[in-house]
Amino acid sequence: MVWDVFVSYRHQAPDGPWVRGVLVPRLQEAGLAVFVDVDSFRLGMPLVLEMARGVEQSRHTLAVLSPAYLTSNFTELESVLAEHLGLEASERRLLAVMREPCRPRLGIRARLWLDMTTDEEVARNLPRLVEELRAPSGVVS
Protein backbone atom coordinates (compact mmCIF):
# COMPACT_ATOMS: atom_id res chain seq x y z
CA MET A 1 0.00 0.00 0.00
CA VAL A 2 1.20 3.47 -0.87
CA TRP A 3 -0.90 5.46 1.62
CA ASP A 4 -1.91 5.02 5.25
CA VAL A 5 -5.34 6.60 4.76
CA PHE A 6 -7.69 7.84 2.07
CA VAL A 7 -9.94 10.59 3.46
CA SER A 8 -13.56 10.45 2.26
CA TYR A 9 -15.37 13.74 2.94
CA ARG A 10 -17.63 16.44 1.48
CA HIS A 11 -15.93 19.52 0.06
CA GLN A 12 -18.61 21.98 1.12
CA ALA A 13 -18.25 23.95 4.36
CA PRO A 14 -17.90 23.16 7.14
CA ASP A 15 -16.58 19.67 6.23
CA GLY A 16 -14.03 20.54 3.55
CA PRO A 17 -12.29 23.39 5.38
CA TRP A 18 -12.08 21.31 8.59
CA VAL A 19 -10.68 18.27 6.77
CA ARG A 20 -8.11 20.26 4.78
CA GLY A 21 -7.28 22.78 7.53
CA VAL A 22 -7.34 20.64 10.69
CA LEU A 23 -7.59 16.88 10.15
CA VAL A 24 -5.19 16.31 7.25
CA PRO A 25 -2.39 18.54 8.63
CA ARG A 26 -2.60 16.83 12.03
CA LEU A 27 -2.50 13.36 10.47
CA GLN A 28 0.50 14.40 8.37
CA GLU A 29 2.24 15.91 11.42
CA ALA A 30 1.84 12.48 13.03
CA GLY A 31 3.82 11.00 10.13
CA LEU A 32 0.93 9.43 8.24
CA ALA A 33 0.79 9.31 4.43
CA VAL A 34 -2.61 10.86 3.66
CA PHE A 35 -4.41 10.53 0.31
CA VAL A 36 -6.75 13.51 0.00
CA ASP A 37 -8.40 14.28 -3.31
CA VAL A 38 -7.31 17.91 -3.71
CA ASP A 39 -3.65 16.91 -3.41
CA SER A 40 -3.60 13.38 -4.79
CA PHE A 41 -6.07 13.09 -7.67
CA ARG A 42 -4.29 13.20 -11.03
CA LEU A 43 -5.38 16.00 -13.35
CA GLY A 44 -7.46 14.90 -16.31
CA MET A 45 -8.37 11.51 -14.85
CA PRO A 46 -11.99 10.43 -14.32
CA LEU A 47 -13.03 11.19 -10.73
CA VAL A 48 -14.50 7.75 -10.08
CA LEU A 49 -11.25 6.06 -11.15
CA GLU A 50 -9.26 8.34 -8.87
CA MET A 51 -11.57 7.56 -5.95
CA ALA A 52 -11.09 3.85 -6.57
CA ARG A 53 -7.31 4.33 -6.81
CA GLY A 54 -7.28 6.18 -3.49
CA VAL A 55 -9.27 3.49 -1.73
CA GLU A 56 -7.27 0.62 -3.27
CA GLN A 57 -3.85 2.15 -2.60
CA SER A 58 -4.61 3.08 1.02
CA ARG A 59 -4.56 0.75 4.01
CA HIS A 60 -7.60 2.51 5.46
CA THR A 61 -10.41 4.75 4.23
CA LEU A 62 -11.56 7.34 6.75
CA ALA A 63 -15.17 8.53 6.36
CA VAL A 64 -15.76 11.99 7.86
CA LEU A 65 -19.44 11.70 8.76
CA SER A 66 -21.86 14.63 8.62
CA PRO A 67 -25.31 15.31 7.19
CA ALA A 68 -23.59 16.58 4.03
CA TYR A 69 -21.55 13.36 3.75
CA LEU A 70 -24.76 11.34 3.67
CA THR A 71 -26.18 13.27 0.70
CA SER A 72 -23.28 12.58 -1.67
CA ASN A 73 -23.23 9.68 -4.10
CA PHE A 74 -19.45 10.10 -4.37
CA THR A 75 -18.77 9.67 -0.65
CA GLU A 76 -21.16 6.71 -0.59
CA LEU A 77 -19.18 5.11 -3.43
CA GLU A 78 -15.90 5.64 -1.56
CA SER A 79 -17.19 4.02 1.61
CA VAL A 80 -18.81 1.12 -0.28
CA LEU A 81 -15.54 0.46 -2.15
CA ALA A 82 -13.63 0.38 1.14
CA GLU A 83 -16.20 -1.95 2.71
CA HIS A 84 -16.03 -4.26 -0.31
CA LEU A 85 -12.23 -4.44 -0.23
CA GLY A 86 -12.38 -5.15 3.48
CA LEU A 87 -14.84 -7.99 2.95
CA GLU A 88 -12.75 -9.46 0.12
CA ALA A 89 -9.61 -9.54 2.25
CA SER A 90 -11.27 -10.00 5.67
CA GLU A 91 -9.63 -6.74 6.74
CA ARG A 92 -10.84 -3.69 8.62
CA ARG A 93 -10.43 -1.06 5.89
CA LEU A 94 -13.22 1.45 6.63
CA LEU A 95 -12.94 3.69 9.70
CA ALA A 96 -15.15 6.66 10.52
CA VAL A 97 -15.22 9.84 12.56
CA MET A 98 -18.42 11.71 13.38
CA ARG A 99 -17.83 15.38 12.61
CA GLU A 100 -21.48 16.48 12.79
CA PRO A 101 -24.32 14.46 14.30
CA CYS A 102 -26.10 12.39 11.65
CA ARG A 103 -27.55 8.92 11.07
CA PRO A 104 -25.32 7.06 8.59
CA ARG A 105 -26.48 4.07 6.58
CA LEU A 106 -26.52 0.71 8.32
CA GLY A 107 -23.11 -0.45 7.04
CA ILE A 108 -21.47 2.49 8.81
CA ARG A 109 -23.80 2.59 11.84
CA ALA A 110 -22.81 -1.00 12.59
CA ARG A 111 -19.21 0.11 13.16
CA LEU A 112 -17.63 1.89 16.09
CA TRP A 113 -16.64 5.41 15.08
CA LEU A 114 -14.82 8.22 16.87
CA ASP A 115 -16.62 11.36 18.02
CA MET A 116 -15.04 14.52 16.62
CA THR A 117 -18.07 16.80 16.90
CA THR A 118 -16.31 19.34 19.15
CA ASP A 119 -12.76 20.64 19.50
CA GLU A 120 -12.54 18.84 22.85
CA GLU A 121 -13.52 15.52 21.26
CA VAL A 122 -11.00 16.08 18.45
CA ALA A 123 -8.24 16.64 21.02
CA ARG A 124 -9.32 13.55 22.98
CA ASN A 125 -9.82 11.19 20.02
CA LEU A 126 -7.16 12.25 17.51
CA PRO A 127 -4.37 10.25 19.23
CA ARG A 128 -6.54 7.12 19.07
CA LEU A 129 -7.29 7.75 15.39
CA VAL A 130 -3.58 8.14 14.62
CA GLU A 131 -2.84 4.90 16.48
CA GLU A 132 -5.54 3.06 14.52
CA LEU A 133 -4.30 4.44 11.20
CA ARG A 134 -0.72 3.39 11.96
CA ALA A 135 -1.82 -0.18 12.67
CA PRO A 136 -2.07 -2.69 9.83
CA SER A 137 -5.55 -3.15 8.38
CA GLY A 138 -5.65 -6.43 10.26
CA VAL A 139 -7.64 -9.54 9.68
CA VAL A 140 -11.17 -9.38 11.01
CA SER A 141 -12.03 -12.34 13.21
Give the residues covered by each predicted segment.
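Conserved beta-strand scaffold positions in the cores of enzyme catalytic domains, especially
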Residues: 94-96, 113-115
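Short, polar loop motifs at secondary-structure junctions
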Residues: 98-104
